[in-house]
UniProtKB/Swiss-Prot annotation:
This is Protein Rv2204c. GO terms for molecular function: 2 iron, 2 sulfur cluster binding; 4 iron, 4 sulfur cluster binding; iron ion binding. The keyword Acetylation applies. InterPro entries: FeS_biogenesis, FeS_cluster_insertion, FeS_cluster_insertion_CS, HesB-like_dom_sf. The modification N-acetylthreonine is found at T2.
Length: 118
């Protein structure tokens, strides 16, 4: 008898660091919602042409790619996936700044303010 595995959902190449996963999990726990996932999307905008959009989402879209990090689902839509392949999302908490940061090896340049990339 042959057992075939069901095809798994397609995963993306974005990495959520331990610090970012812990912060996202903390925010989700504060909201009391276990149905939300962290979504990263790339949209037109900013002076360099493209900008990131990072938000919690309760929707699953056709073609979404999903991976889980520390109990947090990270979703990338199929149109954004090529732009963020190999990117790393971190959470920084220092005197100078606090927030999520994205290190993307595909970005060839960014604007002076750092809000957008190309």
């Amino acid at each position: 008898m042959t057992v075939q595995n069901e095809p798994s959902a397609k995963t993306h190449g974005v990495i959520l660091t331990e610090a970012a996963a812990a912060k996202a999990k903390s925010l989700l726990d504060q909201e009391g919602r276990d149905d939300l996932a962290l979504r990263i999307a790339v949209q037109p905008g900013g002076c360099a042409g493209l900008r990131y959009n990072l938000f919690f989402d309760d929707r699953t879209l056709d073609g979404d790619q999903t991976a889980e990090f520390g109990g947090v689902r990270l979703i990338v839509d199929r149109m954004s996936a090529p732009y963020v392949e190999g990117a790393s999302i971190d959470f920084v908490d220092t005197i100078e700044k606090q927030g999520f940061t994205i290190d993307n090896p595909n970005a060839t340049g960014s604007c002076a303010c750092g809000d957008s990339f190309n």
